[in-house]
Regions:
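Conserved beta-strand hairpin/beta-sheet module of binuclear metal-dependent hydrolase folds
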Residues: 9-65, 71, 175-185
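Divalent metal-coordination and catalytic microenvironments
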Residues: 19, 39, 48, 58, ...
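Histidine/acidic-residue-rich catalytic or RNA/ligand-binding cores of hydrolases
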Residues: 238-249
């Protein structure tokens, strides 16, 4: 592998820890939007491919790092959203010996992505093809389902530990590097773009669940990582424990405002936009557009709305079911 930084007209690679290389995939042509991470070793593993639209940038970066077709041993995605896993099929084709690692609840969508792509097309419309691209299928015999606590062997005693972390999505997991101590957190901690510097929760539909998301942050904290590497974007220059607490407080604040608006019949997106507008004070229109494109208030509001509807519906159903202990055998 080459040295601390590789920069060209289309490639930006930074070594962020011994044997860990951050790749800027240049999603949508923006710098520092979506990262992939190569963990070096006898069995190199790529964490996150980014979108299909930026996969050529990723492949060029891997080539610049010295990887040939037979060298990559694994590709791991924290979840199957297209900005994280859209390039999996292309990368699997370019590296025919690489095993693809994914959460159990996402595996079938990598093998047959038609439903995932159709759902994304309904959400993003024309933006799907212009910003993200699609997702080519991965042969099912190349896919390995990761269980919580399972290790991906990188060789020389180094491994990545899978940490089940639903909340952002039911198919989300973190990956903890045994050597550097870095935790690759996907979107479970939120989004923090370096040129904006504001941590914002990522709560998209259809899977967002507040209780699970908060629990996942606690699970990350229990692992005591040396640093948090976000897909959006990079290693956050904060104490990991403090960052995770900030993520918890920020997520709870957004959820509280969303629920208040929901209860009072207000538009959730409008309420969130007004409540947290000050977070973006001082940033120019391009930086605001960059953040809103990746992690917009309307997307977060839709996730909160879906979560509130699901939670309230479940509570109403539970209340409506009568309890008849006489038929359970518990009374005699």
């Amino acid at each position: 592998m080459q040295g601390p930084g590789i920069v060209s007209a289309t490639v930006a690679v930074t070594t962020i820890a011994p044997g860990v290389h951050e790749i800027d995939t240049l999603l949508g042509g923006w710098e520092h939007m979506t990262a992939g991470y190569l963990i070096d070793g006898p069995r190199p593993v790529l964490v996150e491919t980014g979108s299909q639209s930026s996969v050529e940038v990723l492949l060029e970066a891997l080539a610049a790092l010295g990887l040939e077709a037979e060298d990559l041993a694994g590709v791991a995605v924290t979840h199957i959203h297209l900005d994280h896993a859209g390039g999996v099929g292309d990368v699997a084709r370019a590296f025919p010996g690489a095993t693809v690692y994914v959460h159990e609840k996402g595996a079938r969508h990598l093998a047959n992505p038609s439903r995932l792509v159709d759902s994304a097309a309904r959400v993003y419309g024309p933006l799907l093809d212009s910003l993200y691209g699609r997702l080519d299928p991965t042969p099912s015999d190349r896919i390995h389902v990761l269980a919580d606590g399972e290790q991906i062997d990188i060789g020389a005693g180094r491994h990545l530990v899978a940490v089940d972390s639903p909340g952002h999505a039911k198919h989300h997991l973190g990956l903890h590097d045994s050597d550097s101590g870095l935790l690759f957190a996907g979107d479970a901690v939120g989004v923090r773009l370096p040129d904006v510097g504001v941590l914002r929760p990522a709560t998209p539909p259809p899977d967002f669940d507040l209780e699970q998301a908060l629990t996942s942050l606690g699970r990350f904290a229990e692992r005591r990582p040396s640093g948090i590497a976000l897909a959006h974007y990079g290693v956050v220059p904060s104490d990991p424990a403090e960052l995770l607490e900030e993520a918890r407080e920020t997520l709870q604040s957004w959820a509280d405002e969303a629920e208040r608006a929901w209860r009072e019949g207000e538009d959730i997106a409008t309420a969130l936009g007004q409540r947290f507008a000050a977070d973006l004070d001082g940033f120019d229109a391009d930086k605001r557009k960059k953040l809103e494109t990746l992690n917009g208030v309307h997307s977060n509001a839709a996730g909160f709305r879906r979560w509130l509807e699901t939670r309230d519906s479940a509570a109403a159903t539970s209340t409506a079911i009568p309890t008849n202990t006489a038929t359970t055998g518990e009374n005699g």
